[in-house]
């Protein structure tokens, strides 16, 4: 049997997978010299020789088996692509061959070890993932719902609004009642002696409502609430006011002193009342007694203080409403300013007399330099004459004197 030499050559393609080529050189058939490569050979013979000399991995294993049988025919197979096999690399490394084969086999063994490590890591990951499943289903400790960090939320009951009790309402009513009681002014006293002709009405002095005048002043009553004990008997009646037009020049009222009704003049007020402008507002029990009346200046003191005692070249608006159109009683006063709001007097059940039930026969309206006398359709003549007196203590007294009808 001819002597053969086997050379294991491991080459790297793309630095990934080696493959082994087994070359069987026969001294008789193959020329090993360098010149032999320069000689042209037949292609068919070379292909056959290559097929005979190239062996696959499995054929090499069977070739180097312990039996040592050489009966099997050597076959060569061309490997078209790279092939990786850790088992083959491990087997090749155990071969007892030359230095070149051992170095290549050692490199192959390293790649095999690396691949085995990767396989072990993947196996461990698979085992871990397989262990997590039964722990989740069969062990409640691993469930996050029952761990110490779990949070349990309980549904809170909706808040129910507590209705207000009767005590709260009583307290609020008390507060309102106390507020109304504090804001109410003092009542006005009415003194009417029985079986007498002269009746007097005393008004308390109101220091805050007084307007400063050079000579003297009268108090102005504020709006007061109804304080009557018998509300069914209204004390005041409506007096239709006269529409007032502004006058270009201030004119003093000219009244007829020869009135058939007579005149009562108070001695205390005759000194200063003859030269003062005045205005007597209507007496009413309701605030809506004269809704159409234009706004009238409440006091003449502003004009007096600005232009002196007797204003000149100032527009003055004034009107006269008295019990008698030709009466000179109103000329004795500077001003009678009473509130047009509802005012009730307590303890009055007698017959209404005086200015409280006064309907004027005629009304005087002054416009410029002319004096117009305008009759009123609804006329109720009373035999009463009013007079207002300034007292020393600062309070005013309104005296009503009854006279027989003529």
Swiss-Prot record:
Tissue specificity field: Expressed in the hypocotyl elongation zone. Not found in the root elongation zone.
Keywords: Phytochrome signaling pathway
Disruption phenotype: Reduced phototropic response. Altered light-induced deviation from vertical growth and decreased phytochrome-mediated inhibition of hypocotyl elongation and cotyledon opening. No visible phenotype at the level of leaf flattening and leaf positioning. No effect on negative root phototropism.
UniProt induction comment: Down-regulated by light.
A single GO BP: red, far-red light phototransduction
Keyword Endoplasmic reticulum: no
Family affiliation: Belongs to the PKS family.
Note: PKS1, PKS2 and/or PKS4 are essential for phototropism but not for inhibition of gravitropism under long-term blue light irradiation.
PANTHER family: PROTEIN PHYTOCHROME KINASE SUBSTRATE 1-RELATED, PROTEIN PHYTOCHROME KINASE SUBSTRATE 4
Self-association state and partner proteins as the record states: Interacts in vitro with PHYA and PHYB.
Reported function: Modulates phytochrome-mediated control of hypocotyl growth orientation. Involved in PHYA and PHYB signaling. Acts as an inhibitor of asymmetric growth. Not involved in the control of leaf flattening.
Name this protein carries in UniProt: Protein PHYTOCHROME KINASE SUBSTRATE 4
Gene name of the record: PKS4
């Amino acid at each position: 049997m001819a002597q053969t030499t086997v050379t294991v050559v491991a080459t790297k393609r793309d630095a990934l997978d080696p493959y082994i080529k087994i070359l069987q050189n026969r001294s008789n058939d193959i020329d090993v010299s360098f010149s032999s490569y320069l000689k042209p050979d037949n292609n068919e013979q070379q292909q056959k020789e290559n097929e005979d000399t190239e062996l696959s991995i499995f054929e090499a294993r069977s070739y180097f088996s312990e039996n040592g049988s050489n009966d099997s025919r050597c076959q060569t197979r061309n490997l078209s692509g790279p092939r990786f096999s850790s088992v083959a690399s491990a087997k090749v490394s155990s071969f007892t061959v030359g230095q070149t084969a051992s170095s290549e086999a050692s490199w192959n063994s390293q790649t095999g070890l690396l691949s085995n490590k990767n396989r072990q890591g993947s196996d461990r990951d698979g085992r871990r993932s397989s262990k997590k499943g039964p722990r989740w289903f069969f062990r409640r400790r691993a469930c996050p719902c029952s761990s110490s960090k779990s949070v349990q939320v309980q549904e809170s009951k909706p808040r129910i609004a507590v209705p207000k009790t009767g005590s709260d309402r009583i307290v609020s009513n008390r507060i309102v009642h106390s507020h109304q009681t504090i804001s109410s002014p003092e009542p006005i006293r009415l003194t009417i002696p029985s079986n007498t002709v002269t009746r007097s009405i005393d008004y308390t002095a109101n220091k805050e409502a007084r307007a400063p005048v050079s000579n003297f002043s009268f108090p102005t009553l504020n709006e007061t609430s109804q304080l009557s004990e018998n509300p069914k008997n209204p004390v005041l009646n409506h007096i239709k006011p006269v529409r007032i037009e502004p006058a270009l020049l201030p004119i003093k009222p000219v009244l007829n002193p020869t009135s058939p009704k007579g005149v009562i003049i108070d001695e205390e007020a005759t000194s200063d009342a003859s030269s003062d402008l005045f205005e007597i507002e209507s007496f009413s029990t309701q605030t809506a007694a004269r809704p159409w009346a234009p706004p009238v200046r409440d006091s003449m003191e502003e004009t007096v203080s600005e232009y002196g005692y007797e204003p000149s070249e100032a527009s003055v608006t004034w009107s006269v409403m008295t019990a008698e159109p030709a009466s000179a009683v109103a000329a004795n006063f500077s001003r009678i300013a009473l509130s047009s709001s509802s005012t009730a007097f307590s303890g009055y059940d007698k017959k209404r007399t005086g200015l409280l039930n006064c309907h004027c026969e005629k009304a005087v309206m002054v416009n410029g330099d002319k004096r117009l006398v305008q009759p009123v359709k609804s006329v109720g003549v009373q035999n009463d004459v009013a007079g207002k007196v300034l007292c020393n203590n600062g309070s005013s007294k309104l005296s009503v004197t009854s006279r027989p009808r003529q």
